[in-house]
């Protein structure tokens, strides 16, 4: 969102100098997913908890959400997923990552440069994804190159079968703990073996 505030400010500066502010747009498809703005004031036992919490969220973020609504029509190449639709990494995985892009008769692999620490989740789909800071994201939006270090690829063989009462979450947490102890950071992981086959 901060990047779009900066672009709006750039439009104002260009207009002040007599230029055409409508020419300031991201040159690559840009998606703004509004998440993590919901404060839970009503508990899960209240059947209307979601609606009540969303109403509070809308009231507290009225100016912010108004600006975000404006960006949907003011800028080209901007797609907005409003609040109340889920969290960024879930939306990226389920709705926003086509894996293969197709434009002007050319097909090419999708990439994702995002400011959320969970951006790399889309790597699971074969989308090359990196998390960056806000300024680097703005550079990408304006057509500047982003350096992507190709990470090491590490195979993780899962053996055995999942036992009754053990959830996929239990396995993920145990794997995360193990990989941290082994100092596996910044690598692509490929899971294979009979244990991986039994997960799906």
Where is each model-derived feature located?
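Fe-S-dependent hydro-lyases/dehydratases of central metabolism
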Residues: 1-200
């Amino acid at each position: 969102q901060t990047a779009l505030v900066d672009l709006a400010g750039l439009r104002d500066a260009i207009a002040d100098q007599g230029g055409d502010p409508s020419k300031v747009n991201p040159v690559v498809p840009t998606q703004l997913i509004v998440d993590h703005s919901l404060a839970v004031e009503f508990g899960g036992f209240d059947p209307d908890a979601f609606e009540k919490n969303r109403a509070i969220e809308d009231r507290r973020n009225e100016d912010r959400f108004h600006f975000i609504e404006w960006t949907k029509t003011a800028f080209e190449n901007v797609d907005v997923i409003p609040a109340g639709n889920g969290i960024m990494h879930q939306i990226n995985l389920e709705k926003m990552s086509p894996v293969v892009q197709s434009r002007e008769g050319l097909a090419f692999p999708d990439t994702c440069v995002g400011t959320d620490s969970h951006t790399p989740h889309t790597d699971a789909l074969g989308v090359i994804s990196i998390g960056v800071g806000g300024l680097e994201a703005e550079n990408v939006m304006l057509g500047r190159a982003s350096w992507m270090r190709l990470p090491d690829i590490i195979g993780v063989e899962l053996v055995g079968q999942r036992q009754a009462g053990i959830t996929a979450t239990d396995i993920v947490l145990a794997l995360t703990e193990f990989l941290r102890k082994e100092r596996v950071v910044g690598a692509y992981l490929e899971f294979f073996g009979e244990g991986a086959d039994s997960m799906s």
